[in-house]
Swiss-Prot record:
Protein name (record): Retrotransposon-derived protein PEG10
CDD domains the record matches: retropepsin_like (cd00303)
Gene Ontology CC: cytoplasm; extracellular vesicle; membrane; nucleus
Broad class of the protein's primary localization: membrane
Length: 958
């Protein structure tokens, strides 16, 4: 023992000795001689602190290296297990012996680290036991956020079922790490090298994994998905499965989930559910809905089919070969049937391209009068109306269908299924669906001829109608679409190759899923939240059409007929308002009555507009004959216009348009025509007839020109007072939803359809702004002016010049600055204020060399706030008001204008009505700040000292 531990005179080793050494020297110490062990402790205390911790750092590094080797060892063992499974499945390979590999496994372990050998090397043979099944191994995780939850659950399940000991956190972390691939494996390697404590804390490691790879917006995305989820044409089982999958990511209570589940059900199931006792749980609600759906299906199958049996029965179901079908058509012989089957011809009509169950001849024979059957798009021939023939049973599985949401201002959202067909040339909508939902229509610029797959034109003829721009949502994807109106009974909406080529979506045909990941959709089709309106404009009336004022003087010319005919054509055809849908049951015997009523409407419309303008511009001596002249001329002109110049197909559209917009109130206007008495000319107020000899109540045009310096003088020359809309609504009028705001006979609503200009200054991506500038303004120069005046130019330092170049280049790239063709460009002035460079714009200097047209300027509310908080208003007439009203000027002055916001897929400019307002008080230029800033005023002088007290007198002292 003395030999083992008594070498007290030997120097200590470089690292300090461990605390539990084997020195068992019990020799008593001499009080006079210092002990060698005390000398060693004193020397150990004098060493630096980093050398004292050197042993611990080295041990920790060795442990980390061994643990990383253990991770690689586990991965190799799993790879070997995969090979063993492949060899077990192959009956021919029986000579495989895993013993050599098992003998080589201990070579990777460290002989000095006995603990690591016991934790990693010893349990390795357990992976080769028969109790562990290879199918229970979790799938490799590559960092996909959608697969993080299943991966964590599979790892937990495997560790609980496995015979291997996973009680140590280090083994659990190594196992999970071996299941990571791709970017997830790279993250785990770097994370474990930096944070070594995670190797001994399985819970903390899984929390870090979840924090990195879990979708932070998972809950918000689940809320949006579950609110848009609808049952649609599918069964309740599929709807409930999708609902429960989304509900897993939400923390909603069960009553909230039950309410949302009922919102997405079909109306028939929801109606039947309301007649029963309310279920208590979500599972009971789903079970009740499934029972209701099955009962409705049984009732529908037991109900006799009112349609003709020949439409749904196959041709070989008839037994009598001599029984005529349709009176004159006999049954086919066996030879003829065999020939048509071999040549893939229709068994009903003998033509190619379709089969007997979808034969258009059969559909046209059984279709009602006035409705032509035929294909809806360029593709396979379509069938007859859906109310006569039911679709085939495989219709829901053969085609790619999606659920669309169509938004129209002031109307409930429409949910409709659409088919995606790459063989269709455009985007189509069924005319029955349009009529049923009153979707606004307009006449196309050019008719479109659509052909079927066999090259023949469709039976419904050329397409002459299209819908207005509608907001269409497909999941999180929002766009603006215009559909061509045709006949498509099986699919109300068809999205064709034009839609596919524009958005370029990623379609997975096996799962029927669509992902919009193209650059076009990322920048233009994102879902924007509706921004609430902070202010409501004072509602003006729409402005008088400019070219109507332009043609006032030609109207009083002797050649008035030609100019009025040209004006009426220009006014009717490019009218921005909607054309009503055609009535499929229109009969020709109603044409005479319709033309008579149409003539009265047009007479009232033209008389109402022409009389006040002509009364204003004609000499006073011609006022008394003005009514008689207009009365005779308009009757003669309209009769000739309707019978010789206007196409008969447009009569009905024009009649319905004027009937909806000019139908007089029966309580106030029993006669649609103006009075025939020349002493009672047409009125300026729709409810009162003023005297024609009385001067118009408007001011003198020369005085109007000086009323407001911001107004265009040319506009005031033709300005005339217009009638005020009736303040009272008709009692039979249906009450509008609270979405509208009634103000003076007009309504204003939140601009849902203008979402793409609300966020025009909000970047949708890093340094990417949506395009919002349509045209480049043209500046008219004063004749003789050579150039616009410029300010003084001062030299700039190199750093200031680089800062200006970077600023301009960055904003041109982002789209906030656009190159212009205007003379002299923009007046950019670089100023240095408070140690910061700023770019300002001098907007007063160019006015001395340009023509001041005083265009109507648009002002937005809350100009100091971000621009996307501004709201726009659109003005439409209240139904029941008989006359279109026009702008009248009050203070502050307001009117409407068409503002370009972009282009559609055809390249046509999309304009929206906006509010234009100007006022002397709200448009004053702010004072220009002085540079350098003025010195503060000097402080006021101090107050004078108080006067001294008077001296005391001798009398008072005595």
């Amino acid at each position: 023992m003395a030999a083992a531990g008594g070498s007290s005179n030997c120097p200590p080793p470089p690292p300090p000795p461990p605390p539990n050494n084997n020195n068992n020297n019990n020799t008593p110490k001499s009080p006079g001689v210092p002990d060698a062990e005390d000398d060693d402790e004193r020397r150990h205390d004098e060493l630096p602190e980093d050398i004292n911790n050197f042993d611990e750092d080295m041990n920790r590094q060795f442990e980390n290296m061994n643990l990383l080797d253990q991770v690689e060892l586990l991965a190799q063992s799993y790879s070997l297990l995969d090979h063993l499974d492949d060899f077990d499945d192959d009956d021919e390979d029986d000579d495989f012996d895993p013993e050599p590999d098992q003998d080589e496994l201990p070579e990777y372990s460290d002989d000095d680290d006995l603990e690591l050998q016991g934790a990693a090397a010893a349990p390795i043979p357990n992976f080769f036991s028969d109790d562990d099944c290879l199918e229970d191994l979790p799938e490799k995780f590559d960092g996909n956020p959608d697969m993080l939850g299943p991966f964590m659950y599979q790892c937990q399940l495997f560790m609980e079922k496995s015979t291997r000991d996973f009680s140590v956190d280090r083994i659990r972390v190594c196992f999970v790490t071996s299941m990571l691939i791709g970017r997830a494996a790279r993250w785990a390697t770097a994370k474990l090298q930096r944070c070594t404590y995670l190797m001994h804390n399985y819970t903390a490691f899984m929390m870090e994994l979840k924090h990195v790879f879990e979708d932070p917006q998972r809950r918000e995305a689940a809320k949006r998905k579950i609110r848009r989820l609808r049952q649609g044409p599918g069964p309740v089982v599929d709807y409930s499965n999708a609902f429960q999958m989304i509900a897993q990511d939400l923390d909603w209570t069960e009553p909230a989930l039950m309410d949302q589940f009922q919102e997405g059900l079909n109306p028939d199931i929801r109606a039947e559910l309301s007649r029963q006792e309310a279920p208590k749980t979500l599972a009971a609600l789903i079970t009740a809905c499934i029972h209701i759906e099955r009962r409705l299906a049984r009732d529908a199958a037991a109900k006799p089919d009112p349609s003709p049996r020949a439409l749904v029965m196959p041709p070989n179901s008839q037994t009598d070969p001599t029984e005529p079908v349709g009176g004159a058509r006999m049954r086919l012989s066996k030879e003829e049937k065999e020939r048509r089957r071999k040549m893939n011809l229709c068994l009903y009509c003998g033509n190619g391209g379709h089969f007997a169950d979808t034969c258009p001849a059969k559909a046209s024979k059984n279709s009602p009068p006035g409705k032509l059957p035929g294909p809806a798009v360029g593709g396979p021939s379509a069938t007859g109306p859906e109310r006569i023939r039911s679709p085939p049973s495989e219709a829901s599985t053969q085609h790619l269908q999606v659920m669309l949401q169509i938004h129209m201002p002031g109307r409930p959202t429409l949910f409709v299924r659409a088919m995606i067909d790459s063989g269709a040339s455009g985007n189509f909508i069924d005319q029955d669906f349009v009529i049923q939902n009153a979707i606004p229509l307009r006449i196309k610029d050019w008719p479109v001829m659509v052909e079927a797959i066999d090259g023949h034109p469709i039976a419904s003829g050329p397409i002459i109608l299209e819908t207005h721009h509608l907001i269409v949502d497909l999941g999180d994807h929002r766009e603006i679409l215009s559909f061509d109106v045709t006949q498509s009974p099986f699919f109300p909406i068809v999205l064709g190759i034009r839609w596919l080529s524009t958005h370029d979506p990623h379609i997975t045909w096996s799962t029927r899923s669509i992902v919009f990941n193209s650059d076009y959709c990322r920048l233009r089709c994102r879902m924007f939240a509706q921004i609430p309106s902070n202010l409501l404009f004072t509602v003006p009336q729409p402005n008088l059409h400019p070219y109507l004022l332009h043609h006032v003087h030609p109207h009083v010319h002797p050649h008035m007929h030609q100019h009025l005919h040209q004006h009426l054509h220009q006014f009717l055809h490019p009218d921005p308002h909607q054309y009503p849908h055609p009535d499929p049951h229109y009969h020709h015997h109603q044409q005479a009555d319709m033309q008579h009523q149409l003539q009265q409407y047009l007479y009232q419309y033209l008389y109402y507009h022409l009389y006040p303008v002509m009364h204003h511009h004609l000499p006073p001596d011609q006022h008394e004959h003005l009514h008689e002249y207009l009365h005779q001329y308009l009757h003669q002109y309209l009769h000739q216009f309707l019978h010789h110049h206007l196409h008969p197909d447009l009569h009905q559209y024009l009649y319905q348009y004027l009937h909806n917009h000019m139908n007089p109130d029966p309580h106030h206007h029993p006669h649609p025509d103006p009075p025939q008495d020349p002493h009672h000319p047409p009125h300026q107020d729709p409810h009162q007839h003023p005297d024609p000899h009385q001067d118009p109540p408007h001011q003198d045009p020369h005085q109007d020109a000086h009323q407001d310096p911001h107004m265009d003088p040319h506009l005031h020359q033709h300005q005339h007072p217009q009638p005020q809309p009736h303040p009272q609504q008709h009692p039979n009028h249906p009450q509008q939803p609270p979405f509208f705001y009634h103000m003076a006979g007009f309504r204003i609503y939140h601009p849902v359809r203008y979402y793409y200009i609300q966020n025009v200054y909000t970047p949708v991506d890093e340094h990417v702004y949506p395009g919002h500038r349509v045209v480049d303004p043209n500046i008219e120069m004063i004749p003789g002016a050579h150039s616009l005046p410029s300010g003084h130019l001062y030299s700039m330092s190199e750093s200031e010049m680089n800062a200006l170049r970077n600023f301009v280049d960055r904003n041109v790239k982002d789209g906030l600055m656009t190159p212009t063709v205007a003379p002299n460009g923009a007046q950019v002035l670089q100023v240095k204020r408070g140690w910061k460079l700023q770019v300002t714009y001098n907007c007063r200097a160019p006015q001395s060399g340009t023509i001041q047209n005083q265009y109507l300027r648009m002002s937005l509310p809350n100009m100091g706030d971000p621009a996307h908080l501004a709201s726009y208003g659109e003005f439409v007439q209240v139904p029941g008001y008989p006359y279109p009203a026009y702008v009248y000027y009050t203070s502050p002055h307001m009117m409407t204008a068409w503002y370009p916001v972009g282009r559609d897929v055809h390249g046509r400019i999309i304009v929206v009505p906006v509010v234009i307002t100007w006022s002397q008080n709200t448009n004053r230029q702010p004072p220009v700040p002085q540079y350098p800033p003025p010195q503060p005023p000097p402080p006021p002088p101090p107050p004078p000292p108080p006067p001294p007290p008077p001296p005391a007198s001798s009398c008072s002292a005595a």
